[in-house]
Amino acid sequence: MRMASFRPKYITFDCYGTLTNFQMAEAARDLYSEQLDEPRMQEFIRNFAAYRLDEILGDWKPYAEVVHNSLERTCKRNGIKFRDEAARVVYERVPNWGPHADVPAGLAKVAKEIPLVILSNAMNSQIMSNVEKLGAPFHAVYTAEQAQAYKPRFKAFEYMLDMLGCGPEDILHCSSSFRYDLMSAHDLGIKNKVWVNRGHEPANPYYGYTEIKDISGLPGVVGL
């Protein structure tokens, strides 16, 4: 599907999950698979994801606290002893994560024509390690730490738009997540959206987007 009639001023991206291979589930398995059978492990991973979302809906706090609190709550719910060291191990893995295999080539093609921007639920001290692995130049990288708010809060998106000096009508926002990105983008009037279907969440056509299976499909969306 193409949007050849619309050439955005910027293409804005979620990073973790959309571009970077987000490996929280793998980290949880490494820590707890010996204590949980497979059905319980899958439930633990679902709980961990849910608590991470819940932890970021209030006032901003460092991502290390988000990981710590969500892992502690998940362990409590699943009857597992929580250790501070486990949360530290998970947090320190984040900057080591690289891109999905489809990302570098797809981004590089688009970056030749349209400035690329990241809006990430990240810490300043971690995100550039991930960005450097993506294989394409970025016009700007904005973090939750800079915005003092995590997505899906509107404040994070508003910070990005203010920093770019543009309106919601000027960008194309690209994410694999409705709950973190595309729902808020819709509510804020970002009409041009791309859903990268990486299997994290089911389709939700109400929110109005172009679907691609991976970043290799992005150039075609903007007529490249």
Specify the residue positions occupied by each region the protein language model found.
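Conserved strand-to-helix beginnings and helix N-cap segments that scaffold or border functional pockets
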Residues: 25, 104, 153-154
